[in-house]
């Protein structure tokens, strides 16, 4: 009976979240269509009115026109990325929840932290429906069981208590089931994920990241991180999720996908891991083999 009551409450929250996402998706799609029309119109106008012949004045005019188009194209690309995130959120807005009470606020109700692939937030009211799995507070889900916890926020270390850890199975915007656990919360989901891993492509492990893996993924203290392990121990998965984390953290430092490269043993391996970052809502990164790298860096006389 208690489960049915909780299930009904969770369905209400899921509906509220999906309704908000759907509303924003419609608005973003309309805005994106407008941006596309503006980019096309600006390009047409440039080719019809701007002269690319010699002369300083013409060069300045052409440069200004190109800068304007690049700015419009960047806005269009950003809108398109937001649409991709919203579509993804509409399918599975979140996969976990932790109830957290910060020290000093024990008399207040615990804050329900829903965790998903990307943040879902009302920019007007600042209500956060879902926290990105890479946010500092989301580390509570990966690193702790119920009880005393702490996480490192931009303002410093935040301490408190987790009173509930919950995981969800949500597909196509429908809640199939959830379960709570005080001990080894991710074992059930991990076993299920592994049982469905009969695929020719590597999958993301964002729902089943272990404590030690999370510490590697979020490490910002070391410039170089070496991870050792036997074959099949998850080294590549951790590396790709670390890439997603670094791109999320590196927005302020302008760290983008084209700043990162994977050195793969062969092209087949590069194809095998190609789906992970898009699953996480990030742009894919370049993958080179050692042979290609040496061919590009070294002289043509070198034979491998």
Segments from the language model and where they lie:
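Extended, charged low-complexity regulatory segments
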Residues: 1-206, 210, 214-218
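P-loop NTPase nucleotide-binding module
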Residues: 243
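Post-Walker A alpha-helix
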Residues: 239-240
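Alpha-helical nucleic-acid-binding subdomain
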Residues: 247-304
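Walker A (P-loop) phosphate-binding loop of P-loop NTPases
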Residues: 232
């Amino acid at each position: 009976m208690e489960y049915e009551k909780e299930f009904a409450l969770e369905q209400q929250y899921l509906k509220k979240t999906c309704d908000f996402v759907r509303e924003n998706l419609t608005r973003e799609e309309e805005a994106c269509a407008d941006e596309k029309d503006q980019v096309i119109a600006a390009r047409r106008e440039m080719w019809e009115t701007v002269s690319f012949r010699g002369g300083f004045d013409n060069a300045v005019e052409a440069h200004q026109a190109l800068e304007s188009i690049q700015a419009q194209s960047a806005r269009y690309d950003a809108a398109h990325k937001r649409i991709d995130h919203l579509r993804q959120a509409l399918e599975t807005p979140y996969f976990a929840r932790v109830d957290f009470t910060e020290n000093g606020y024990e008399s207040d109700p615990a804050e329900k932290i829903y965790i998903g692939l990307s943040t879902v937030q009302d920019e007007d009211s600042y209500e956060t429906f879902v926290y990105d799995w890479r946010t500092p507070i989301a580390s509570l889900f990966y690193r702790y069981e119920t009880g005393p916890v702490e996480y490192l926020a931009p303002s410093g270390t935040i301490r408190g208590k987790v009173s509930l850890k919950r995981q969800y199975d949500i597909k196509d915007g429908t809640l199939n089931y959830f379960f709570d656990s005080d001990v080894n919360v991710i074992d059930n989901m991990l076993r299920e994920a592994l049982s469905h891993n009969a695929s020719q492509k590597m999958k993301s492990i964002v729902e089943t990241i272990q404590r030690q893996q999370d510490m590697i993924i979020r490490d910002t203290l070391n410039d170089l991180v070496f991870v050792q392990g036997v074959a099949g121990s998850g080294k590549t998965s951790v590396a790709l999720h670390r890439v997603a984390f670094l791109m999320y953290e590196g927005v302020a430092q302008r760290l983008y996908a084209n700043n990162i490269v994977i050195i793969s043993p062969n092209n087949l391996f590069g194809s095998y891991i190609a789906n992970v970052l898009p699953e996480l809502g990030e742009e894919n990164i370049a993958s080179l083999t050692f042979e290609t790298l040496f061919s590009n860096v070294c002289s043509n006389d070198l034979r491998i």
